[in-house]
């Protein structure tokens, strides 16, 4: 239980690293990526895994939190993931934090 609390407190720092990486993605030696990998390696030792979500994957409320919808005329895209705005994580197979996603909604 103490590990879970500590890890939850650390997730915003991982989010900040993700944001920094996205803003510096074209730099050759991005130190933020090294820091992120090191932090994820530590988390992995305690059973933390990133929830993998692919673009156009069907929305799954057991792993995702829909924070917004994107209207589309394509009915095949309805309820599929448009974008991941915040990564989700599991701890020993249980959701620690749901991934925040934008989901298509057919008009």
Where are the predicted features?
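Structured alpha/beta interaction-core segments
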Residues: 14-107
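Charge-rich, N-proximal long alpha-helical rod segments
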Residues: 1-11
């Amino acid at each position: 239980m103490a590990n879970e609390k500590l890890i939850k407190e650390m997730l915003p720092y991982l989010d900040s690293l993700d944001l920094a990486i996205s803003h510096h993605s074209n730099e050759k030696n991005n130190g933020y990526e090294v820091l992120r990998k090191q932090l994820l390696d530590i988390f992995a030792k305690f059973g933390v895994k990133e929830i993998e979500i692919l673009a156009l994957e069907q929305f799954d409320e057991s792993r995702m939190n829909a924070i917004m919808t994107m209207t589309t005329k394509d009915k095949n895209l309805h309820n599929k993931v448009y974008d991941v705005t915040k990564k989700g994580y599991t701890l020993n197979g249980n959701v620690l934090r749901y991934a925040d996603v934008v989901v298509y909604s057919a008009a």
